[in-house]
């Protein structure tokens, strides 16, 4: 395979080297707003010379406490040291629980293991294959950020792409590498950090990432890195969790909050098991966390973390179409689409919904926000690139952390 330039391939968690895209001076004091959900809240406004952006809601009586919760546009951790701490937590979680590995009981690293994972993945996510377009990647230099157990990796390789994987965890790198060994496929596998990709500028024709970049503290920085490693004219295909989704706005904000009260009793755990069909072990872990600190569990950021990828997941974020597009301001031909509907979001009736209606619901209020974008063929000075007007919508859901 081609020797793609690699820089600091072993620096899994490097220190911050670049200023944050959205750092501003002249922040204003928090201002009060009314709450949709009853509790007194403050909306925090940031003002620059040309625009203002409301970025957070803080449930607190103290302006000082509100100020401490300001988290800008997907850069969800305010200090470099805290950012590194959170990233280590993320790394540890996914090292112990590689993406999708919990959906099979087959021995890890066996052909049956990979086969069962793929059957489940593409049954649950039928739109994924068309969103990526593997058949169009022959001969392209493809980078996947966050390879998981290698389902898409294998499809890229079999389509003739010159495939490279980078993942924060050694577990995912090893599992995907083993898959390639079993299939006689060629690829490159590197443990590295999406916020500081270990590749030279312009190394790839396509950068793909499915459900990964919303788990890193500084998502805007990862998008800048995607832009950097793409060759002129190269494409990015990225999936992030969708803020304006039924899952976030209804399931997490309302249904899961009500379920938390149900999980406080033994009978409630049994009832929840019948309604949501989740593993009892997972429900009991939720119950333990609720018992330890009910208020902390019901904090919206914690609700998002613990009810997306497992009760011990340390970090998830959600993005609107607008906030996602703003992160891709350096690109052209930016297009978004929404996919994925889970029948379990409507307990009791979800599985009765016809597939045609389910597909429509997914296209409107689905959980997966896909962003398709292309790097400009010619470098343009930053002040000549049209940036979208600043949104007054909170950007990532660390930007809407509710502090009890």
PLM region descriptions:
Residues 314-332:
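Short alpha-helix
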Residues 108-140:
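Conserved alpha-helix/loop element of class I SAM-dependent methyltransferases that forms part
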Residues 195-206:
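A short acidic, Gly/Pro-enriched loop at the edge of an enzyme's catalytic core
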